[in-house]
Every structure is written in structure tokens, then in C-alpha cells.
């Protein structure tokens, strides 16, 4: 049994094409066969529409499954006709790239941050091997790549790509000779050389009549004076978009002089000077007013952007830190610029501290920053703090579950990347400790439980301890039986949780931490014999007897303790450990508790221990007979609970108990338990009971001549409920074959 029931995620469904591409991407082995060289090809002669072919390639890259083997499916240009190819962060060799992608007549290729073995020279060599591709390729993004291998230096490697209109080589070891080569391209209109090793921009004059977009963020090795730089820029006759932003490290006054130079760049519609010094509202306003067509100004990390004119609320978009609109624009435009993302998140945190309405639009931008900079501590620290502000308490219920799932997975990645940073771990735990996230949002709960347990074992912060055990207690109820067993099999987890229980018991403290810890142990021992054995071997039984003695009037504590001991009692190999007179005395007392939740679990322990017959009962037989009589009598006195007081993953533990015809009290407890959950949550439990073959078990009991009348009455009630459920839902599933457990002995 488990402590909490599960809920189903029904909202924020992905599109049909997203679902299809996700399935194909994750299950390629179902659709493909392997060639002699290890690459995959589609088994069926399917033809993908061009848009879906592009989408599948991008999905495979995003999911991290694009490699030398899987990219082989795109060798067939009849099945997959690629035009807009995105292979960002893929791990493919030069040969695989050449054979799979270069035969296509691509219009666009984004190969940002592919593995270091695939160099820019390799990519250009492959692309230029296809004459039609030399003309068709219009946009090429090579951010974060290596120019060429040390063994094979490359010069004039761009010149073959005559059709290129847009090129991005940011964060590349790109030098002046490369710029000179690029500036000879006859159709180039857009160039991004941010964070490269370019020292002289004079070659740009070769593009003066056609360059419309120029991005040169953070050119640290530029060796030109301000006057020389402005002299080049002023000759770019048709330039419409200029980015000379920086990371606040330099004191150059190029931005101020550009803004104050009359008539420079008259066709400009977009200017980014974020991170630059000596920028004022007055200068920016005058510059914009002189160019009525301007639509964007970048002012993040400057002293400007605080006037109403530059608020960013109207047609003029502004990145800055003065208000929410500017900050969000910064996160949107600078998602791949680590320093600016950090800066924007820092200011966003202050703005979202007292937020009152759900803002999924902002949360999506925060998640993007986290995804793009997974190993940057300052970004993850600021982002995780913003996530908490944007999802705390009721705010989470206004956020789509897919977005929450994405954000939660980013939090787990941060916890994994920075396991020893206490504030980051605290931020992530604060966000995870949300009913909406823990109960409804799809994410890797098994991984989350492991990460939270690892944190719990390494920290003693009392407030955070409470949150951690609360998270674990809920996550454990959401895991599959196999995952729960795997998690509980980690001995350190059981030891740590028992340590917390021992601490609280010695302090005679009943608080949320104790209750959550007991719930966590309860859920982790559910249908997990290994975890139950760890519990016994680490003196868990002795400790729990002490808990019962220390808190005799705390029914909520008693319920959790007895719930866990029910799980222990389900493991027949451990029955001998529970055959302790003092323990059974406690259980017998609690059997007569006025709280049905307490009496129910006490009865369950006795039902399991007495079900195996007299031969394995190691105490006085008179005690067993007395307990069976009291068990039967107590069950008949139970009132009907108002709500569902327990959740079960399976009815399998009950079926052996139903076969104990010599001990009707045991049968009665099992039937009462099944009737209780089926009446409170018919949709879930009636279907589960039918699926697991419960109908056959119940019918056998009602027709058996030795069935006690009290048991027959309850089983008939369950059968009536099943019949109503089948009539209402049309349920026709064939029962799963179940392995029968050990049968009861008299």
C-alpha cells in the first residue's frame, strides 16, 4: 500500500506532429534496420513531407539521439527531403555529416555546438562537394565550433558557398583572414562575428553595398581605435541592424561616439549597445528620433533605458533593466549570451518577488536561459530563484504542465551539476516542494527522488530537511513498483530516514518533518521486500515500537507507522521478525482504536501474520486464536470512512488473504479493504481489480461453501460495484495473468 494516490495529467497536450516526431525520435529501432556500416535506414519506403523531415532532424538533435548511426536515415533524399537542417549539439563525424546531409539541397544549416571532431572546415568541405548546395544554401550557423584541426589548417574555406546570405560564426576561433574570405561572398547580407578573434574590421568594406545585419558582440581582440571603427561602420551604406554590445569589461566610448555622430547609418532600424559605458537616455533618444524607422535599442547593463520614451512598451522594443518589458525582451534576445542572461535574471528576481498572477510567458524565458547555460552557476542560481518566485503556491496552477515539466527537469539538471552549492540546492528544493509540480507535472521522479535523498544525507538544515522529506514522501508514491524497490534498495536512504525518525522520537517532537519522513518510509517499503529487509536490519521495528510508545495519542503518527508495518507484514520471509509479544501487544491495543484509520492498519498487520497458519505461528496458539476473534469483531464495528484513507498500487497482496477460509477474519479484512477503495474511487480501483483478475477471485469466494456470511456479504457488495462499473464504462479488458502468492494454511 502507498500513502498517496496518483493523479492524471490531462492538460497542456502537445500537438499531434510533436507527438509523432517524439515517438519516431525515441523509437527509431522500431522503424529502422541497420546497414553494414552501422547506420540506420527506414525499413518501409515512407516519404516524409519536407517540413516533417526538417522537424524530425531537429527533434533528434534536441533529444540528443542524433549520431553517426541515426543520422543515416537522412541519406535517402527521396524519403527525407531536407531544406532547413538543425543539428545543434549533435555528435556526428565528418563522414556521417557528408553522407547524410550534404546530398540535400539545403537552404539553411544550423550546426551550432556540434562535437569538436566536426570542424568548420569539415562542414564547408562537405557542403561544397555538392554544386547545387553551394548555390542553394542561404543561411549557415556555425556558432561555437572549431575552425579546423591542427593537422589541417584551412584558409579561404568559405568562398565556395556562393549562395550564402547569412553567416554566423560567434564563439569561434575566427581570425582576420577568415573575415577577409567571408567578405568576398557575393550575396552576403548578414554576418555575426561575436566573440571571435577578429582584430580589424576593414574587410567589411567589401560588403558596404549589401551588408544589412552586423553583429559583433564582445569583440575582445579588436585593435582599432574608436575613430577607425566608426570610419568603417559609417561606410556600410545599407546597414539596418548593428550590434556592438559588450559584457561591461571594457571602457571604450564607441557607443557614446556612435550615438553622437550626426547622420551616421541613416537606414539603421536596430542598434544594440548593451553593456557599453557612457550611454545616456538623452543621447539614445536623439539618435532614435533622427531615425524614425527604428524598432529596437539594446540597453541592458547600461545607464540608459529609464525614461518613458525608452520604456519598451510601444513600437520601439528595448532591452534593459528598468521594467518587466525590457527584462523579458533581454531574456528573449540574449538567451545564448551568458553574461546578459545572468544580468537579466538578476533584475527579474527582484521584479517577481511579489508577483500575484501566473506568468508562463516569463517562466518560459527563464527555462530557456537555464537550458542554454547548464554549467554556468550564476545563471542557474538566479534562474532557480526566479523559478521559485514564478511557481510558488497557487501560481503553479496557472502554468501549463508541459512548461512546468520542462522547468522541473532543468532544476534537476542544476541540482545534479552543482551538488555542493547549498543555495542552489535550496532554491531547487523550494520550487520542487509544490503540490502542483509533485502531483501533476511530468518529469523524471525517480531521478528527482535520488537527488533529493542525496541532499538530505549531506545536510542538517532543519527547514530544508522538512521540505526534502516532504518531496520524497510524495515522489515515492508516484514511482513504479520497480523504481520504488530500486530507490529503497539503496541502504543509505533507509538509514537516513530512520535517523530522522530517531532524532524526532528522542526529542519527543511531532512535526511535519517526522510525518513526512514516516510517509516516505511507508511509500518506499510498498511492495519492496528489499527495502523492508533494510528496515528490519537497521532496527526499524524496535524504533517504530518506540515511536508508538512515545506518541500514544497521535493518531496520524500511528496511522503512518502501522501503514509501513503493513508493508513489512506482506513479506512472508519477515514474519518471524514480527513475532514479538511486546509488538503484538501494541498492535492489539491499536486494533481497538476509535480511529478507523488506525484500527484498519493494525488489523492488516494481524491479518497478514495470522494468514500463514498455525505451523508458522511461533507464539502461543491461544494468542493467535484470540487475535483472530478480535480482528473479526473489530472489522464489523468499523464505520464507513468519509474519504479514501489509503491508496494501493495493486490488489495482488490481497488475493492470498481471500483464500484463507479457515480464518474468516483475515478474509474479512482483505474484502473490507477492497470494498473501501473500490467504493471511494471506482474509476481507478474497479478497473484495477478487473484487470488483475479480481472478479474470478471474488466469484470463487461467494460460491465457496466455507465462506463466512460476513465475508460473503462484503464480496457480493464488491461484485455489485464491479458490475455497475462495467455497465457504466463498458470495461472489457482481459485480466492480466498473475502469479499466485503462497496460499493460506489453517
From Swiss-Prot:
One Pfam family linked to the record: ZER1-like_2nd
Protein name per the record: Protein zyg-11 homolog
UniProt KW keywords: Leucine-rich repeat, Repeat, Ubl conjugation pathway
LRR repeats by residue range: 185-209, 216-241, 265-289
Family label: Belongs to the zyg-11 family.
Domain of life of the native organism: Eukaryota
Function summary: Serves as substrate adapter subunit in an E3 ubiquitin ligase complex zyg11-cul2-elongin BC. Targets substrates bearing N-terminal glycine degrons for proteasomal degradation.
Naturally occurring in which organism (per UniProt): Danio rerio (Zebrafish)
InterPro entries xref list: ARM-like, ARM-type_fold, Armadillo, LRR_dom_sf, ZER1-like_C, Zyg-11_UBL_adapter
Cellular compartments per GO CC: Cul2-RING ubiquitin ligase complex
Repeat recorded as keyword: yes
Disulfide bonds: none
GO biological process, one term: notochord development
Amino acid at each position: 500500500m502507498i500513502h498517496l494516490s496518483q493523479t492524471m495529467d490531462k492538460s497542456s497536450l502537445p500537438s499531434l506532429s510533436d507527438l509523432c516526431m517524439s515517438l519516431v525520435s525515441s523509437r527509431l529501432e522500431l522503424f529502422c534496420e541497420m546497414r553494414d556500416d552501422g547506420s540506420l535506414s527506414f525499413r518501409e519506403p515512407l516519404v516524409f513531407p519536407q517540413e516533417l523531415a526538417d522537424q524530425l532532424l531537429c527533434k533528434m538533435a534536441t533529444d540528443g539521439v542524433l549520431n553517426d548511426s541515426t543520422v543515416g536515415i537522412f541519406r535517402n533524399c527521396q524519403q527525407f527531403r531536407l531544406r532547413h537542417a538543425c543539428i545543434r549539439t549533435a555528435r556526428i563525424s565528418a563522414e556521417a555529416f557528408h553522407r547524410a546531409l550534404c546530398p540535400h539541397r539545403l537552404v539553411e544549416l544550423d550546426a551550432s555546438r556540434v562535437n569538436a571532431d566536426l570542424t568548420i572546415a569539415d562542414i564547408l568541405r562537405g557542403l561544397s562537394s555538392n554544386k547545387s548546395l553551394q548555390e542553394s544554401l542561404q543561411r549557415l550557423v556555425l556558432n561555437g565550433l572549431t575552425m579546423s584541426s591542427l593537422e589541417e589548417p584551412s584558409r579561404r574555406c568559405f568562398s565556395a558557398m556562393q549562395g550564402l546570405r547569412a553567416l554566423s560564426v560567434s564563439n569561434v576561433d575566427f581570425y582576420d583572414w577568415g573575415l577577409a574570405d567571408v567578405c568576398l561572398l557575393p550575396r552576403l547580407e548578414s554576418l555575426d562575428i561575436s566573440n571571435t578573434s577578429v582584430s580589424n574590421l576593414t574587410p567589411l568594406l567589401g560588403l558596404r553595398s549589401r551588408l544589412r545585419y552586423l553583429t559583433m558582440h564582445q569583440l575582445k581582440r579588436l585593435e582599432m581605435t574608436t575613430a577607425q571603427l566608426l570610419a568603417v561602420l559609417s561606410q556600410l551604406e545599407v546597414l539596418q541592424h548593428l550590434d556592438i554590445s559588450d559584457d561591461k569589461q571594457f571602457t571604450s566610448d564607441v557607443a557614446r561616439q556612435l550615438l553622437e555622430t550626426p547622420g551616421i547609418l541613416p537606414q539603421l532600424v536596430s542598434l544594440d549597445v548593451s553593456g557599453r559605458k557612457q550611454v545616456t537616455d538623452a543621447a539614445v533618444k536623439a539618435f532614435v528620433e533622427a531615425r524614425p524607422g527604428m524598432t529596437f535599442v539594446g540597453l541592458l547593463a547600461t545607464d540608459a533605458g529609464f525614461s518613458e520614451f525608452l520604456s519598451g512598451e510601444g513600437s520601439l522594443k528595448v532591452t534593459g533593466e528598468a521594467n518587466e518589458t525590457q527584462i523579458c525582451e533581454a531574456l528573449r534576445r540574449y538567451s545564448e549570451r551568458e553574461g546578459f542572461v545572468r544580468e537579466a535574471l538578476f533584475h527579474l528576481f527582484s521584479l517577481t518577488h511579489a508577483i500575484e498572477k501566473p506568468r508562463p510567458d516569463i517562466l518560459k524565458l527563464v527555462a530557456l536561459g537555464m537550458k542554454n547555460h547548464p554549467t554556468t552557476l550564476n545563471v542557474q542560481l538566479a534562474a532557480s530563484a526566479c523559478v521559485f518566485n514564478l511557481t510558488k503556491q497557487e501560481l503553479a496552477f496557472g502554468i501549463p504542465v508541459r512548461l512546468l515539466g520542462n522547468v522541473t527537469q532543468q532544476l534537476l539538471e542544476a541540482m545534479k551539476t552543482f551538488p555542493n552549492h547549498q543555495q542552489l540546492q535550496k532554491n531547487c528544493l523550494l520550487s520542487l516542494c509544490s503540490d502542483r509540480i509533485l502531483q501533476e507535472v511530468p518529469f523524471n521522479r525517480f531521478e528527482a527522488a535520488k537527488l533529493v535523498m542525496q541532499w538530505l544525507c549531506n545536510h542538517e538544515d532543519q527547514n530544508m530537511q522538512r521540505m526534502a522529506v516532504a518531496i520524497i514522501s510524495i515522489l515515492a508514491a508516484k514511482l513504479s513498483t520497480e523504481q520504488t524497490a530500486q530507490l529503497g534498495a539503496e541502504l543509505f536512504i533507509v538509514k537516513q530516514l530512520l535517523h530522522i525518525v530517531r532524532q524526532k522520537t528522542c526529542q519527543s517532537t511531532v512535526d511535519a518533518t517526522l510525518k513526512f519522513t514516516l510517509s516516505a518510509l511507508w511509500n518506499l517499503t510498498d511492495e519492496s521486500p528489499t527495502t523492508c529487509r533494510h528496515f528490519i536490519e537497521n532496527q526499524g521495528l524496535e524504533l517504530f515500537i518506540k515511536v508508538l510508545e512515545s506518541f500514544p495519542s497521535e493518531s496520524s503518527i500511528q496511522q503512518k507507522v502501522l501503514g509501513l508495518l503493513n508493508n513489512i507484514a506482506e513479506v512472508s520471509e519477515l514474519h518471524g521478525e514480527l513475532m514479538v509479544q511486546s509488538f503484538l501487544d501494541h498492535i492489539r491495543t491499536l486494533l481497538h482504536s476509535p480511529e478507523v484509520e488506525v484500527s484498519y492498519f493494525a488489523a492488516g498487520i494481524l491479518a497478514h501474520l495470522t494468514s500463514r497458519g498455525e505451523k508458522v505461528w511461533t507464539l502461543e496458539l491461544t494468542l493467535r486464536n484470540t487475535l483472530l476473534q478480535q480482528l473479526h469483531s473489530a472489522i464489523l464495528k468499523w464505520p464507513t470512512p468519509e474519504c479514501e484513507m489509503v491508496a494501493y498500487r495493486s490488489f495482488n497482496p490481497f488475493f492470498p488473504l481471500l483464500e484463507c477460509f479457515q480464518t474468516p477474519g483475515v478474509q474479512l479484512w482483505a474484502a473490507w479493504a477492497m470494498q473501501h477503495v473500490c467504493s471511494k474511487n471506482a474509476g481507478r480501483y474497479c478497473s484495477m481489480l478487473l484487470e488483475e483478475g479480481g472478479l474470478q477471485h471474488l466469484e470463487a469466494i461467494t460460491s465457496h461453501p466455507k465462506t463466512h456470511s460476513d465475508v460473503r456479504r462484503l464480496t457480493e457488495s464488491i461484485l455489485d460495484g464491479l458490475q455497475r462499473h462495467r455497465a457504466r464504462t463498458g470495461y472489457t479488458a482481459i485480466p492480466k495473468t498473475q502469479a499466485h502468492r503462497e496460499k493460506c494454511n489453517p
